[in-house]
């Protein structure tokens, strides 16, 4: 499951019994400081990325949920590993792990990833996967999209299973990826 830290922060705030009142107090404080526009928006908890991505490796698919104009949407996409070019001579440390560089073209962009061989999980943020270690950092050529791990911990939580999610997805409108993206970027 992949989702934004800010989404987690906002959802956690709203999970409190008085979460909406706390949110209102953050907004009132920011307005009181004279913040406007982007500064005001960044001063209060809000979602920056509305999509949540569920990777179903056994079925080879990705389920994406997203929110647009008051409606929740769900679409499925193929879980395809990118065709990575691993550069064995390029190394860098990310979060205390020595990482190796890999590059690929994916959905019209050139991407650079740094993956940790000492974390043998072939996964990463968003739809990125297929390297022989956890993708710790990935970005496109212009760094318009940039994802970097900021922490890692092992938890003993109940695994995410799609059987449980099916009932949660009942209020989502099913759509295909292309139609969703056309609606989103219209």
Feature-to-residue mapping (PLM):
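Short helix-to-loop capping/linker segments positioned immediately adjacent to catalytic or ligand/cofactor-binding
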Residues: 87-94, 123-125
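Extracellular or lumenal secretory-pathway regions
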Residues: 1-83, 89-91, 98, 143-186
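Gly/Pro-enriched, hydrophobic low-complexity segments
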Residues: 100-165
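Structural motif
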Residues: 94-95, 106
């Amino acid at each position: 499951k992949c989702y934004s830290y800010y989404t987690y922060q906002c959802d956690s705030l709203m999970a409190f019994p008085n979460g909406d009142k706390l949110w209102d107090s953050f907004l009132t404080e920011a307005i009181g400081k004279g913040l406007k526009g982007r500064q005001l928006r960044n001063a209060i908890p809000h979602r920056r990325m509305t999509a949540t991505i569920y990777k179903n490796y056994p079925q080879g698919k990705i389920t994406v949920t997203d929110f647009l104009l008051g409606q929740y949407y769900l679409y499925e996409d193929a879980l395809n590993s990118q065709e990575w070019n691993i550069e064995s001579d390029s190394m860098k440390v990310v979060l205390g792990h020595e990482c190796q560089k890999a590059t690929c073209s994916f959905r019209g962009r050139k991407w650079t990833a740094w993956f940790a061989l000492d974390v043998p999980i072939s996964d990463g943020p968003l739809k990125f996967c297929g390297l022989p270690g956890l993708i710790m950092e990935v970005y496109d050529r212009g760094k318009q999209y940039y994802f970097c791990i900021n922490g890692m911990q092992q938890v003993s939580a109940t695994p995410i299973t799609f059987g449980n999610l099916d009932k949660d997805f009942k209020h989502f409108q099913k759509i295909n990826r292309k139609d969703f993206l056309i609606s989103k970027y219209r």
